[in-house]
Regions:
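Basic, helix-initiating cap at the start of DNA-binding domains
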Residues: 3-16
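Conserved hydrophobic/aromatic packing and binding residues within compact polymer-binding modules
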Residues: 17, 32, 43-46, 72
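Recognition helix of helix-turn-helix/homeodomain-like DNA-binding domains
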Residues: 36-53
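DNA major-groove recognition helix of helix-turn-helix/homeodomain DNA-binding modules
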Residues: 54-71
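Short, charged recognition helix plus adjacent turn
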Residues: 2-3, 63, 73-89
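Short basic helix-loop element that most often maps to the first helix and adjoining turn
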Residues: 15-34
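Helix-turn-helix DNA-binding elements, focusing on the entry/boundary residues of the two helices
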Residues: 17, 28-29, 40, 55-58
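Short amphipathic helical patch at the helix-1/turn junction of helix-turn-helix
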Residues: 11, 22-23, 52
Length: 89
C-alpha cells in the first residue's frame, strides 16, 4: 500500500510540475532543464512520475518558474496530512 501511495504521489508531483512549466509558457522540457541545471531526461522522468526527487533538485527546477517550494506543495497539504502515520494510544 505504501508503494502505491508513493507512486501516486510521484505522479501528482510530476503532473503539477508539468502544469506549472506549461503555465509559465515553457513548452520545452529542455529549456527548463537547462535553466535549472538538470538533465532533460531527469526532468522528463520527474514529470512522468517515474522517479522521485530531492528537495534540492525540485527547488532548482522551480526557481526558473519563480515558484516557491511552499507554493508548489500547497495543493498537496491535505494529501500529506491524511497519509501521515497515526500514533497509537
Amino acid at each position: 500500500m505504501a508503494q502505491h501511495h508513493n507512486t501516486a504521489l510521484r505522479r501528482q508531483i510530476g503532473n503539477r510540475l508539468r502544469d506549472l512549466r506549461v503555465q509559465a509558457g515553457i513548452t520545452s522540457q529542455e529549456k527548463l532543464a537547462f535553466s535549472a541545471g538538470v538533465h532533460r531526461t531527469a526532468l522528463g522522468r520527474l514529470e512522468r512520475g517515474e522517479s522521485g526527487v530531492t528537495i534540492e533538485v525540485l527547488a532548482a527546477v522551480l526557481a526558473p518558474l519563480e515558484i516557491s517550494l511552499a507554493a508548489f506543495f500547497q495543493p498537496f497539504q491535505s494529501m500529506m496530512l491524511s497519509a501521515a502515520p497515526r500514533r497509537r494510544r
